[in-house]
């Protein structure tokens, strides 16, 4: 089973992905975590440190290249794995980032989404932007503006692909989110006799 997790920064994607894989392994199942980051955090830290940043199109080009390579490698690994595969982020995330930046969808990402195997579940971790902002600031590894998180949330919801996502409320504890994810997966998995 292939599960893709999406959501704004601070929604708990990575925490939920790790917990889901750890939970499955603890129950004796094969599980694999694949991360499809785009190096946004590293680029923003680099920009802060040296006092310059790429223009939106330049940043998108770099992020898209990194994310596409990661997603393609992840799908290749997922095809060879027998068990639960959890992808932390996907191409949908880049499409939402493009929308926030006022850039078009382009042709490559929609084309890849058509060609790549569909996930069994795409789960969007929905969180109030203020709560996400507090989480981001608490972890202290990067910085986000509240307005950007609000725009990112709206961008996700406006994607045509969003209708295929199952929305999970990620405002609670990581344990609450994991419980909701396990419920969603249980509904999707076929009953084995």
Model features per residue range: what roles?
Residues 8:
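P-loop (Walker A) phosphate-binding loop of NTP-binding proteins
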Residues 32-103, 107:
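ATP-dependent small-molecule kinase phosphotransfer cores
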